[in-house]
A protein has these predicted regions:
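Phosphate-handling DNA/RNA-contact segment within nucleic-acid enzymes
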Residues: 1-68
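Short, acidic/turn-prone active-site loops that include or flank metal/cofactor-
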Residues: 49-55, 74-76, 100-102
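Extracytoplasmic/secreted cell-surface and envelope-processing proteins
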Residues: 40, 79-81
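Replication-associated primase and helicase/ATPase modules
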Residues: 31, 62, 66-72, 81-136
Length: 136
């Protein structure tokens, strides 16, 4: 079976919250693309099952008053990550946009990806505008 995709998602509704029973909404939340990325990150990571957020997860983040959010998407999803950052910043959520370069969280391993997450400062409006100007 040859495919250009690493993982092929089934054609079913994705409006679910991955690992919902394991999420602690009171501590920083990490949004990532897929389940393997969430497993590699481990710490309160929620997979989007794609590059965009589904309504159920968005409502849970806002409804549970998440205070700090890390967005960890692959480089090919930078415009999606910028859009998510902008959206959650508008709700007053401290948002961190983790730049992975050409790497993938599931390939980086637990220590490296978590160090990168830990080292990422919160976005401010200036940095968000820079991302929008140079990446979209």
């Amino acid at each position: 079976y040859q495919s250009k995709y690493k993982h092929k998602n089934p054609k079913v509704s994705k409006d679910i919250v991955g690992f919902d029973l394991l999420v602690n909404w009171d501590i920083p939340l990490v949004l990532c693309e897929g389940a393997f990325d969430a497993i590699a990150i481990r710490r309160n990571a929620v997979p989007l099952f794609g590059k965009s957020i589904q309504s159920k997860l968005e409502k849970k983040i806002i409804g549970n008053s998440v205070k700090k959010l890390y967005i960890v998407l692959d480089s090919d999803a930078i415009s999606n990550a910028i859009g998510l950052s902008k959206k959650f910043m508008s709700y007053g959520i401290q948002t961190h946009l983790v730049d992975l370069g050409d790497e993938d969280p599931s390939e980086m391993g637990y220590e490296r990806i978590n160090q990168k997450i830990y080292d990422t400062p919160p976005l401010d409006l200036r940095k968000l505008m820079e991302y929008q100007l140079f990446n979209v």
